């Protein structure tokens, strides 16, 4: 059965918060205890740390953090109310809001996870260095593609000047890069840290060639791509919900300060929750552009990001920009 555009973009968007390994889904939370669901990736680091260290205990007694690996599970849970906190791509949250699911964006937890990686020997230092080369981009006609097209336009690079090779998944680009079928690849953190680490034992050392967030500044006048955050649903309505979100974001901000002060210690604390090696969690902190922004405070940056997407395919946001009710 063919996926609807809405569901397709939600599934792809959710997959862009990468799952580097396959994890068993743990869909049953302890009864009546609040749960924050997130991917085993950068945007979840802050939430997982806040839960693990008890920083949310006064606000959300008994709160748990659980990894999701099935976007359909999150979509259905938000719709039914059985899930009321989930870390998702910001545009996936907007899509659900526009479809009437009653969700809001509480915050932004990363200002961008996108990088271009390449063999060190290729000496790619600027976007212009990719002209005439093959660049792997995941998911044609979806977020990474739209971001790259907007950047190429901003830098006056003609669409065919770089030979874009589309892949159907994030991992697919890595073997292509290692065997020389492509010269560089668009990838997200922490997958970038993972492939760089793995390549140290290979004759072909992979490096982080370009930070796409810095290239984005030519498009939006800011180097922040508000890519993902916490989407909240049932239990966060009205003035009481606003107060709860404000308090939650304050806890997250305190958690982020502690994480940045000692990434290795934080990684040791949460590796069990994320089911990810501590050294890779610690390495990814420096490159995940972790932030805690109230969604309403970064609405202009979100709308700039959303407009780039919607101008190329309105279905990715459910047909329109979300109204003010989306931004908590």
Put a short name on every predicted segment.
Residues 82, 87, 97-100, 139, ...:
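Sec/Tat-exported extracytoplasmic proteins
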Residues 303-328:
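Conserved C-terminal helix/tail region of periplasmic/extracytoplasmic solute-binding proteins
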Residues 30-157, 164-167, 183-189, 206-210:
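Short, glycine-/small- and polar/acidic-enriched structural segments
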Residues 237-312:
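Secondary-structure end/capping motifs
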Residues 57-59, 215-223, 291-299:
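Short, solvent-exposed loop/beta-turn-alpha elements that line the ligand-binding surface or hinge
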Residues 3, 9-28:
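N-terminal export signals
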Residues 76-77, 95, 129, 175-176, ...:
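Well-formed, non-transmembrane alpha-helical positions, independent of function
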Residues 91-92, 171-269:
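Pocket-lining segment of extracytoplasmic ligand-binding domains
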């Amino acid at each position: 059965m063919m996926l609807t555009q809405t569901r397709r973009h939600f599934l792809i968007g959710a997959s862009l918060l990468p799952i580097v390994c396959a994890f068993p889904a743990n869909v049953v939370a302890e009864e009546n205890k609040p749960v924050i669901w997130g991917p085993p990736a950068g945007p979840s680091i802050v939430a997982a740390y806040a839960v693990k260290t008890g920083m949310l205990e006064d606000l959300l007694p008994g709160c748990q953090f659980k990894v999701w690996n099935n976007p359909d599970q999150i979509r259905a849970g938000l719709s039914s109310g059985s899930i009321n906190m989930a870390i998702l791509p910001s545009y996936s949250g907007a899509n659900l809001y526009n479809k009437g699911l009653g969700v809001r964006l509480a915050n932004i937890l990363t200002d961008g996870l996108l990088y271009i990686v390449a063999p060190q020997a290729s000496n790619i230092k600027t976007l212009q260095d990719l002209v005439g080369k093959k660049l792997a981009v995941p998911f044609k006609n979806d977020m990474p593609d739209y971001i790259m097209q907007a950047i190429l336009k901003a830098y006056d690079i003609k669409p065919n000047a770089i030979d874009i090779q589309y892949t159907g998944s994030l991992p697919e680009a890595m073997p292509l890069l290692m065997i020389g079928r492509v010269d560089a690849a668009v990838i997200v953190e922490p997958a970038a840290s993972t492939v760089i680490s793995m390549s140290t034992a290979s004759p072909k050392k992979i490096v982080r060639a370009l930070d796409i967030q810095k290239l984005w500044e030519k498009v939006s006048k800011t180097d922040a791509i508000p890519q993902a955050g916490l989407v909240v649903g049932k239990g966060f309505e009205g003035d009481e919900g606003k107060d709860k979100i404000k308090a939650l974001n304050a806890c997250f901000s305190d958690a982020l300060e502690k994480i940045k002060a000692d990434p290795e210690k934080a990684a040791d604390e949460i590796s069990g929750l994320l089911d990810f090696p501590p050294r890779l969690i610690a390495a990814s902190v420096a490159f995940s552009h972790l932030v805690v922004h109230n969604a309403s405070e970064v609405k202009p940056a979100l709308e700039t990001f959303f407009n780039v997407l919607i101008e190329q395919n309105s279905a990715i946001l459910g047909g329109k920009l979300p109204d003010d009710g989306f931004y908590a």
